[in-house]
Regions:
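Short glycine-rich anion-binding loops that position phosphate/pyrophosphate groups of nucleotides
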Residues: 9, 56-58
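Conserved active-site segments centered on acidic
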Residues: 2-38
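Ser/Thr/Gly-rich flexible loops in soluble cytosolic domains mediating phosphotransfer, phosphorylation
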Residues: 3, 74-102
C-alpha cells in the first residue's frame, strides 16, 4: 500500500513514518510510506492509496479533499493522540481502515 503523510514541513512526521514502517514489517504488510510538506500534495498524489494529514495541517482537510477526491484517494487527519505518541501501529491501522472504506 502506498501511504503519503503530509505535514507543515515534511520533517515532523519522519519519526512516525519510521514507526509505521516498523509496525508494517511486524504485521507482514508491504507498504511504501513517505512524508511530504502539505504544499507538495498536488505534485505527489498520483498513485497513492491513502493520504494522511498531520494534525498541524488538519485545517487543510477541505483543500486536501479537493485534491484527493477526484483521484479516488481517501484522506483524513491523523488522530492527535496517535500522532503525538508516534503510535505507528495505530496510524497504520487508521490508514488501512481509510483505504478499506474508500
Amino acid at each position: 500500500m502506498v501511504i503519503r503523510l503530509f505535514c507543515a514541513a515534511g520533517v515532523s512526521t519522519s519519526l512516525l513514518v519510521k514507526k509505521m514502517e516498523e509496525a508494517a514489517k511486524e504485521k507482514g504488510k508491504d507498504v511504501d510510506i513517505v512524508a511530504y510538506p502539505f504544499t507538495e500534495m498536488e505534485r505527489v498524489i498520483e498513485g497513492v492509496d491513502v493520504a494522511l494529514l498531520g494534525p498541524q495541517v488538519g485545517y487543510q482537510l477541505a483543500r486536501a479533499k479537493e485534491i484527493c477526491d477526484p483521484k479516488g484517494v481517501p484522506v483524513d487527519v491523523i488522530p492527535m493522540q496517535d500522532y503525538g505518541m508516534c503510535n505507528g501501529m495505530n496510524v497504520l491501522k487508521f490508514a488501512y481502515k481509510l483505504a478499506k472504506n474508500k
